[in-house]
Structures are given as C-alpha cells and as structure tokens.
Amino acid sequence: VTATKIRLTQFAHGGGCACKIPPGELEAVLAGLIGAGVTDPAGELIVGLDDGDDAAVVRIEHGVAVVATADFFTPVVDDPYDWGRIAAANALSDVYAMGGRPVVAVNLLGWPRDVLPLELAAEVLRGGRDVCGSAGCHLAGGHSVDDPEPKYGMAVTGIA
C-alpha cells in the first residue's frame, strides 16, 4: 500500500475527541483518586484532578506556576502531516487555555507498525514539530508504542 493511497481515518474507530471516555464513566474511574493529596508537595496545586480542566497548574513560587497537560487522539484527517499539526496545536492549546506559555513538549505516538508505513509516522511527528517550532516550544523526544490503532499527541509543560 502506498502512502498516497492510505486514509488514516479508516484506522480509527472514532475521530479525535469522539474517542474520549464519556464524562460520567470517567468520573467513576477517577472517583477514588480525587482529593488524594501528596505529603510534602513540591508546590501548591491550583488546578488538579478534581477540577476536570484542560491542564494541571502548580504554583512553585510567588508569580510562577507550572502548567502540565497530555493530549492525544486518533486521526481526524487523512494527511499525516496535517494530523500531526492538529494534534500538536490541540495539546499546546490546553496550556494556553490555562493562561500559560508552552515551554517543552514530548511526543506521544501509538503506531500500527505492521500495517502503516513508518514514513507516515515520521510525517505526523514532523507536523507536530513544526507547530511546536512556530509556538516557540521545544520538542524534546517522547514515547512510542506499537498499537493497533494510530494515536498521536503530546505531553506539554508550560509556565504561567
């Protein structure tokens, strides 16, 4: 199968956020974790698990907070470069939504390597890299797994 004939969206059971676990089910899964604090925390948790927001925010000193998020999803378009750009912009936008500025991101990639050419994965990552570059955000590695369904996104750390 040539890369030009592959429709990435055919490999996803739902596009993008349509693959999310429904809110009520997710709340049930998270119920035992909410409110479970840490002893001797490294900073003051301003936005956390019990807030259900776009990202976590931890104040580390007066006037300085760390914003952290992770976001990934299945293909929403067929072009791998565009999908990478969309997924990266979506991940970075979570930091912006919390009033922060993205500083560093790492890739999160699930790829069916026996089904889809790795050249397509490289295009997805290139799209993500280009969005990070335009945003002034470092891209510093990431994590990948062999997965029957393609998934891509980023974990992003910012400051506010």
Language model segments and positions:
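Glycine-rich anion-binding loops of enzyme active sites
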Residues: 62-76, 85, 101-160
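N-terminal glycine-rich phosphate/pyrophosphate-binding loops that anchor nucleotide-derived ligands
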Residues: 2-97, 140
